[in-house]
């Protein structure tokens, strides 16, 4: 009685402001968080407001592909 696909998947969240700002200048790094999401409840891209240690503020972290 195995189900086809897992409901919970592991996703990587990346800071959107670090990605935008690192094009112009040398960046110290890009903030990334690893979390899980329920595929049935949130089928589209995941976005959370998390703390970015490189920007020193809370920014929107968006889901990226592995």
Swiss-Prot record:
GO biological process, one term: translation
Entry's Gene Ontology molecular function annotations: structural constituent of ribosome
Record Gene3D superfamilies: Ribosomal protein L33 (2.20.28.120)
Pfam families: Ribosomal_L33
Subcellular compartments: Plastid, Chloroplast
InterPro entries the record matches: Ribosomal_bL33 (IPR001705), Ribosomal_bL33_CS (IPR018264), Ribosomal_bL33_sf (IPR038584), Ribosomal_zn-bd (IPR011332)
The keyword Ribonucleoprotein is assigned to this record: yes
Membrane-spanning parts: none
GO cellular component, one term: ribosome
Swiss-Prot/TrEMBL keywords: Chloroplast, Plastid, Ribonucleoprotein, Ribosomal protein
Main subcellular localisation: plastid
PANTHER family cross-referenced by the UniProt entry: 50S RIBOSOMAL PROTEIN L33, CHLOROPLASTIC (PTHR43168), LARGE RIBOSOMAL SUBUNIT PROTEIN BL33C (PTHR43168:SF2)
NCBIfam families linked: PRK00504.1, PRK00595.1, rpmG_bact
Family classification: Belongs to the bacterial ribosomal protein bL33 family.
Protein name: Large ribosomal subunit protein bL33c
């Amino acid at each position: 009685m195995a189900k086809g696909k897992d409901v919970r998947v592991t996703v990587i969240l990346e800071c959107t402001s670090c990605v935008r700002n690192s094009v112009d200048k040398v960046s110290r790094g890009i903030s990334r968080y690893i979390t899980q999401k329920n595929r049935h409840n949130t089928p589209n891209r995941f976005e959370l407001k998390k703390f970015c240690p490189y920007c020193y503020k809370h920014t929107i972290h968006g889901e990226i592909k592995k």
